[in-house]
From Swiss-Prot:
A motif (GXSXG) lies at residues 51-55. This is Omega-hydroxyceramide transacylase. Residues 289-563 are annotated as: Disordered. One of its GO terms (biological process) is keratinocyte differentiation. Coiled coil: none annotated. Signal peptide: none annotated. InterPro entries: Acyl_Trfase/lysoPLipase (IPR016035), PLPL (IPR033562), PNPLA_dom (IPR002641). One of its GO terms (cellular component) is membrane. The gene is Pnpla1. Induction: Up-regulated upon induced differentiation of keratinocytes. Keywords: Cytoplasm, Lipid biosynthesis, Lipid metabolism, Transferase. Residues 325-335, 350-362, 490-501 have a biased composition (Polar residues). It comes from the Eukaryota.
Amino acid sequence: MDEQVFKGDPDTPHSISFSGSGFLSYYQAGAVDALRDLAPRMLDTAHRFAGTSAGAVIAALVVCGIEMEKYLRVLNMGLAEVKKFFLGPLSPSCKMVQMMRQFLYDVLPEDSYKFATGKLHVSLTRVTDGENVVVSEYRSKEELIEALYCSCFVPVYCGFIPPTYRGERYIDGGFTSMQPCSFWTDSITISTFSSQQDICPRDCPTIFHDFRMFNFSFQFSLENITRMTHALFPPDLVILQEYYYRGYNDAVSYLRRLNAAYLDSPSKRVIFPRVEVYCQIEVALGHEPPPPSLQNLPALRRSPADSSQTHAQGSPKKDRKDSHSSAAPSVQTPESGCKESVESPVSLRVSISKQPSVSPLSPAQPVPVMRPTGPRDSCPINVQTPNPERGVKGALDSATERGMKDALASATDEQSTTTLPPVLLPAADSRGSKTGSSVPIGSPESPRLLLRSSQGATASRATLGLPPLSPSTPPAGPPVEDLGPERPTATGSPALSQLTGSAAPGTGKKAPHKPLLVEGPGEDSNTAKTMFKRKQKTNATRECFHRNAQSKKPASKLKSAPCPLNFPVLPKRVWVTYKPHPSRIQDYSYPEGVSGQNS
């Protein structure tokens, strides 16, 4: 049985065909370097080389024995020239074509036409009839360069007037034959685009949709569309270098397929031993990607200093967590007591501590430890102070510094805020605002209120365990309205109480009394804003009640009593009036017909 001969056998005559590639001739240069490094006999024994466009230049350099390094150096210079202009190679000022032509004059030897005659086949497209013409006979170096220049000329891209070869005008041969001389049975085809060629990119084997264009079968894929764009409008140099290595690796894969084919043949021999050695070296050097189990290995190898630093950074978080979770005020130390405080609602912007308030639901932030130097530096949770009088005074000064003086002055109708100290009461349960049940202010579950009266301050002092003020001290305002045991109501959410009429400081006149009504932000948030922005009326009516000037009957049961000077201290539990939504409030005075029916 005779030995079977395969295409690509270096001992038999064969041909090599280069397709059109444009700027992607980096790919073909990589394939040529792979053949020179690993299978030099394949290039030495090839008796024919064919090429079109930039592939014709590659074929001419291979025939003349010129290294690809020189061609890539000039190609890099042409790329830099194209990147100078906004239109790239379409710019009239671009001199890329002239640079490539000058390169051929410089690099080709004077007798290059002798080597190329009969061995180099250049594909051209004739302008007159649009037929494909293959040129293989050259009489001079200039004629060879003109044939190569005609094969690379793309109208409008390289110019508007086609060049001439032996009196005829020709343009790029890729318009009629992208892969020249593909009908040769012994031809090894090298293509930049993914197709059915011997050496070409292998994008996706599951796509079998091909389309034929320029007498060439293209594989329909997004990668091929990208390559067509890069061939005319070059990308960055890094991407073009990737094309070079891709061509090198694809040529190695082709040579390995030939080795496998000859191993199955009767000869049982490896015709390209350098390819197998090259592949073993690549595996030994570890150019393959590491397994997934070893990718996170550097992250696991950390020095003991890094681990100790991690523990040192984690300790403050633990300390902050412990200080935040502690609920007993009496156990807090001066160092840990002022680290965090509970954030109050927007309507109650009063905080005795000077530290920034942090919400319990927000993530813990590093807070510097500060030692309190006085009662006004103490935290709002720790309400026990060594000096009760100094503690209350510090709280009042801190509240005045926070800006409550201006807010209270606009809401109390030109009354001084120094005689009406705001008192911060314990926080209320959030469920109380939803149910609306009556809860006394003195209880721990009641909402936080700012009672603008001395009685509210006295009640809060009784709640906090402080000694009450002297009864001989005259109160700054009237007492909180007492509704009696038959109609107890209370606020279900944090709110601000409104002052009743009191005597202006420095004058003997008394201001008209106003009903003390407490409003919850859950019912109507706009009413609370109106309370602080607008000046209160001088009469006993509010904006939420309808005016009725003709009616003289005191239809309302809510009345304010004047405050005597010797008013006793309020009890521990104080009831305040809850004002519902304005749409649910009835008029003070009823019409005569309705009042008669009710009677």
